Amino acid sequence: IFNKEDQNELLNKHFAKSININTIDISENFIKKYPNFIKKTLTDLIQATKYFKYKEVEIKDKLYYIFYNVIFETNKNLLQKCLKRLSFVAIGTIADNMPIINENRIILKVGLKEIALRERMSINYLLKDANILTKPNITSTDIAYKIAPILNSTGRLEKADIAINFLLTNDINQIENKFKEIKEINELRKYKEEKAWNSHNKNTIFKNDKFIVCYDNNTPKGISSRIATRLSSYYQKVAIFLTKQDNIIKGSIRSNNKINSKTLISIIPSHLVINSGGHKAAAGFTLHENLLEDFIKELEYATTKVEYETTNENESIPIDAILPKNLTKDSLFKTIEIFEPYGYEFREPILLMKNV
């Protein structure tokens, strides 16, 4: 907060002192550097900021701008510390399948350069295991297919702390021991995933020409999204995979670009769903086990109401560029590298060379 006395008074007034609130006052160091702002409120800072005079900005964005600049103005070395950790952020961005647009592109690009410096022993260990330690440039594709899956396996089996401890340590013995654990967890993940896949036919509870729904109460919830993705790809349908933990059912939707997954869940009455979230391509939700039968009925109804995109066989392929015949392979690769990193919502270019 900024200006603790005033802000705490407002918080106590709002919550009627019903809860204990601990705050950190970021104004103290700022005022030492800029004494003219003593006794100033956040409103005063917003009014004094010229940036807001030339564009319409929502109040939440104004507050973010103020707090961001106050923190970095009084902690000049903080940004450098953050930059040294962007290798982790880059891996996390890809591993969590975040859209590679806007700020994410900048963070990922800088993070990949940080990885290429080979300064993190744990990350180097991952690169070595993937046979890319000596590769000059590490790409988003390298992370997506060779690094992210093995790290993600720990979270899928609810043992993410092992991956965190592995990444953060600089002790070579701990790195070796933790990585051995991670490899074992990944093998277990593969086994459980294959077991769930092999039994999906008997666990299919609803299927038509557009949708398939499976319920397997023995599959770990962290694997449900993987099975949903495989189902969607294999059947070329919208896939929904359900699993159970402690009387709570967790569902994963993969749309195969046929529907808006988030819209599908929104059609189902809210009293049947505990939590839900996602985007067009994928969504997740939870519900109580005793409501499963009602949920399936409503889900079947929702599949008839959600807008479904059919594939047009004559649909044209969007071409990003037409290549000249005299373009060398090295020039082509260099051009493609310029637009790195690629990933979700920022695909590799589709190129055309005529009359080859």
Language-model regions, residue ranges each:
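Conserved DEDDh/DEDDy metal-dependent 3′-5′ exonuclease domain
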Residues: 1-35, 56, 60-67
